[in-house]
Amino acid sequence: MGVSGKYENASFDMEDGAELVFGRSPQEANIVFDQVHADVSRKHCSVRFDGRNNQYIVTDFSATGTYTDGGVRLEKNQPKQLSRGTVIYLGGSKQNAFRLN
């Protein structure tokens, strides 16, 4: 669910194995941000739900980073397992945030 930014209060239903890609490029992302969101890369990150383990797999592809609510920057191109309820931020600000429900 969107916590802040363009997609605040938006909900994205994800079945097991489903993947969302966040970014500014409609060719590379299915959750698309306007060009004014300079801290969001063309292909910023992907989020996949792993129903078997009841977790999300988040992979950062960006120049500006994807962060968890603890302020930890995810390592670029390295899938990271995150628990339900974790909040992720696209870019260095908390302008675009999503809770992994």
Predicted regions and their residues:
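Forkhead-associated
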Residues: 45, 50-87
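Short, solvent-exposed loop/turn segments enriched in Ser/Thr/Gly
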Residues: 40-44
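Intrinsically disordered, low-complexity acidic Ser/Thr-rich regulatory segments
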Residues: 1-38, 48-53, 81-82, 87, ...
